[in-house]
Regions:
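Short beta-strand segments
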Residues: 40, 70, 103-105, 128, ...
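Active-site and donor-binding regions of nucleotide-sugar-utilizing enzymes
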Residues: 95-127
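A glycine/threonine-rich phosphate-anchoring loop and its flanking beta-alpha core
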Residues: 16, 115-183
């Protein structure tokens, strides 16, 4: 496993890169001592990676309440209405200030889960598990979060850094060739 540190004076965070690193999510989360965990994913990624991610979390943190919020897939769903679904899932989980949101997906999921984390109780922690090439090299790094409006992309958002990013290159094998060539 390779570790890089994004050095941002007040809000630095590590990026862990390596085959199988997705299965380390539980042990990495245990370092944060979360009271509750909400995994946000989509219908495409969810059926591929929700089980290994939640299994890792439950093994490391068996007493911590865990919920999964599965959203429809695609940029057209990067809306305030979809964001509300994440916030509703956080409410149903009784997420508090010590809870953590896990973004499991590409850039759309990372943007929305990060924005939800920035809004919930004026900011709770979140982590990124990017599953597309573009999200691994761009959107999961830098803290840009937000949702779209009909008038334009990312009109509502915030800069909000994750606590850490887990990049597993193995997940790219499940992407269609078109996604890889698109970056």
């Amino acid at each position: 496993m390779i570790e890089y540190n994004v050095d941002l004076a007040s809000r630095s965070y590590p990026i862990y890169i390596g085959k199988g690193v997705i299965e380390r999510i539980g042990s990495e989360l245990s370092e944060l001592n979360p009271t509750r965990i909400l995994v946000v994913t989509n219908t495409t990624v969810g059926h591929l990676y929700t089980v290994p991610v939640t299994r890792s979390i439950q093994r490391a943190l068996p007493e911590v309440p865990l919920a999964v919020c599965t959203l429809k897939d695609g940029e057209i769903y990067k809306t305030p209405e979809t964001l509300r679904q994440i916030l509703q899932a956080a409410a149903e989980l009784h997420a508090d200030r010590a809870s953590v949101i896990v973004a499991l997906g590409g850039g759309v999921i990372g943007d929305m889960a990060g924005f939800a984390a920035s809004m919930w109780m004026r900011g709770i922690r979140f982590v990124q598990i990017p599953t597309t090439l573009l999200s691994q090299v761009d959107s999961s790094v830098g803290g840009k979060t937000g949702v779209n409006l009909p008038q334009g992309k990312n009109l509502i958002g915030a800069f909000y850094q994750p606590k850490f990013v887990l990049i597993d290159p193995r997940v790219l094998k499940t992407l269609p060739a078109r996604e890889i060539s698109a970056g």
